[in-house]
């Protein structure tokens, strides 16, 4: 009897970092609790991309929360997908929303939200927030736990 993971191509394999987000493959596994309302959180505290104009590096902490339906995002494929932005030029808003939309397309969750907490460039931090809609009633939704940027406090 299979586990529903036979199709995975990255987990358990030596896998090179994709050249770009477009080339990255997000894989999913079956949700073992499809009738249960629960939250999955991924935190990427060292996300990087490039400014599309200057080529300078941009850094963010991403917090991704989703309520799965039939599938879960396989975490190694997510790690590789996020890493593929390292040499990708895009503005903060584009990176954050593109990540969320790719996740929605990959696993069709009941609900998803993303917080992109970008570190200052030119003295201005940019925080980007997006969600698919209102959170399902009864979903335990903890605060994302990222304090607003305070500079020297």
UniProtKB/Swiss-Prot annotation:
Pfam families with a match to the protein in the record: QueF
Keyword Methyltransferase (UniProt): no
Tree of life domain: Bacteria
Binding-site positions, substrate: 73-75, 92-93
Keywords per UniProt: Cytoplasm, NADP, Oxidoreductase, Queuosine biosynthesis
Function, as annotated: Catalyzes the NADPH-dependent reduction of 7-cyano-7-deazaguanine (preQ0) to 7-aminomethyl-7-deazaguanine (preQ1).
Family: Belongs to the GTP cyclohydrolase I family. QueF type 1 subfamily.
Protein name as it appears in the record: NADPH-dependent 7-cyano-7-deazaguanine reductase
Active-site feature positions: 51, 58
Pathway info: tRNA modification; tRNA-queuosine biosynthesis
NCBIfam families reported in the protein's UniProt record: QueF-II
Gene3D superfamilies from the UniProt entry: 3.30.1130.10
Reactions catalysed: 7-aminomethyl-7-carbaguanine + 2 NADP(+) = 7-cyano-7-deazaguanine + 2 NADPH + 3 H(+)
Gene: queF
Keyword Cytoplasm tagged: yes
Protein's GO biological process: queuosine biosynthetic process; tRNA modification
InterPro entries xrefs: GTP-CH-I_C/QueF, NADPH_dep_7-cyano-7-deazaG_red, QueF, QueF_type1
E.C. number(s) listed in UniProt: 1.7.1.13
Gene Ontology molecular-function annotations: preQ1 synthase activity
Subcellular locations according to the entry: Cytoplasm
GO cellular component: cytoplasm
């Amino acid at each position: 009897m299979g586990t529903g993971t036979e199709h995975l191509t990255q987990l358990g394999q030596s896998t090179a970092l994709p050249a770009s987000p477009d080339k990255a493959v997000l894989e999913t596994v079956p949700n073992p609790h499809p009738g249960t309302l629960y939250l999955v959180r991924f935190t990427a505290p060292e996300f990087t991309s490039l400014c599309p104009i200057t080529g300078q590096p941009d850094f963010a902490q991403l917090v991704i929360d989703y309520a799965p339906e039939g599938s879960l995002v396989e975490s190694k494929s997510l790690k590789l997908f996020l890493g593929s932005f390292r040499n990708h030029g895009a503005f903060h808003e584009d990176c954050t929303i593109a990540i969320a939309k790719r996740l929605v397309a990959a696993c069709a969750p009941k609900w998803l939200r993303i917080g992109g907490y970008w570190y200052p460039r030119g003295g201005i931090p940019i925080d980007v927030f997006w969600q698919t809609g209102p959170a399902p009633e009864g979903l335990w939704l903890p605060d994302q736990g990222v304090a607003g940027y305070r500079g020297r406090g």
